[in-house]
Amino acid sequence: MGLPRPGLWLKRLWVLVQVAVEVAVGKVLMTLFPERVKQNILAMGQKTGIAQNPNFAQDSWIPTFFSTQYFWFVLKVRWQRLEDATEPGGLAPNCSVVRLSGQQCSVWDFMRGNRPLVLNFGSCTUPSFLSKFDQFKRLIQDFSSIADFLIIYIEEAHASDGWAFKNNVDIKNHRNLQDRLRAASLLLARSPQCPVVVDTMQNQSSQLYAALPERLYVLRQGRILYKGESGPWNYNPEEVRAVLEELHS
């Protein structure tokens, strides 16, 4: 299973070079054509909802692009995608997760018979995850009679000691499981209406589902019916709605 280790490291090296070049070019373009680059980033932000969020003025997040923290986070995401173990129609990884009570369980524990199980991966510091949280809740309200839902809280997208945005939720990178459980418990104030679990500190589910910074899946009977594109730009709960409507028709 997976890539042979030498092959994996070669691919990681190539990705490292790619990200380094992208960041270097981005820095140059930001210096030479600052307004044009900012407008391009802002246009992408329209898709995530961050551009419409009054807490995020342009200068609170756009200048962080192509920074050192940006480089390391993007590199982590790209490296993670090399270990993506999922494909539509394939077997869904049965990863270990932890309930907010501290009890260990697995993703498959939340599947019931022939009912679809919607997985929502994300974190409180990911603005698009929170801005579309109400859309996800409406999915639960509309389809709870035919489907089950599970939020899997993963490592922070924009931790205050990482690639941080101004005026964002202030959560540092999780150093232990208790940190992650405390961060996930903040979602309870938003009345998620479905179980919330956290990824292990080995980030097993995040890696195998290539979920960082956020992603949606629909599973049924242990297999993947729908694999959403990775966030933040392509995180779209309405695509899940279309899948569930088709199953219900």
Swiss-Prot record:
Protein EC: 1.21.99.3, 1.21.99.4
Reactions it catalyzes: 3,3',5-triiodo-L-thyronine + iodide + A + H(+) = L-thyroxine + AH2; 3,3',5'-triiodo-L-thyronine + iodide + A + H(+) = L-thyroxine + AH2; 3,3'-diiodo-L-thyronine + iodide + A + H(+) = 3,3',5'-triiodo-L-thyronine + AH2; 3,3'-diiodo-L-thyronine + iodide + A + H(+) = 3,3',5-triiodo-L-thyronine + AH2
Lipid bilayer topology: Single-pass type III membrane protein
Keyword Cell membrane carried by entry: yes
Any one of the GO CC terms: endoplasmic reticulum membrane
Short name of any one Pfam family annotated for the protein: T4_deiodinase
Subcellular location as annotated: Cell membrane; Endoplasmic reticulum membrane; Basolateral cell membrane
SUPFAM superfamilies per record: Thioredoxin-like
Active site feature: 126
Membrane side Cytoplasmic: residue ranges: 34-249
Keyword Membrane carried by entry: yes
One Gene Ontology biological process: hormone biosynthetic process
Single GO MF annotation: thyroxine 5-deiodinase activity
Keywords carried by this UniProt record: Cell membrane, Endoplasmic reticulum, Membrane, Oxidoreductase, Selenocysteine, Thyroid hormones biosynthesis, Transmembrane, Transmembrane helix
Transmembrane spans: 13-33
Segments in the Extracellular topological domain: 1-12
Predominant subcellular localization, coarse grouping: membrane
Assembly description: Predominantly monomer. Can form homodimers but homodimerization is not essential for enzyme activity.
Biological role: Plays a crucial role in the metabolism of thyroid hormones (TH) and has specific roles in TH activation and inactivation by deiodination. Catalyzes the deiodination of L-thyroxine (T4) to 3,5,3'-triiodothyronine (T3) via outer-ring deiodination (ORD) and of T4 to 3,3',5'-triiodothyronine (rT3) via inner-ring deiodination (IRD). Catalyzes the deiodiantion of rT3 to 3,3'-diiodothyronine (3,3'-T2) and 3',5'-diiodothyronine (3',5'-T2) to 3'-monoiodothyronine (3'-T1) via ORD.
Family: Belongs to the iodothyronine deiodinase family.
Protein name (Swiss-Prot/TrEMBL): Type I iodothyronine deiodinase
Organism annotation: Oryctolagus cuniculus
Recorded name of the encoding gene: DIO1
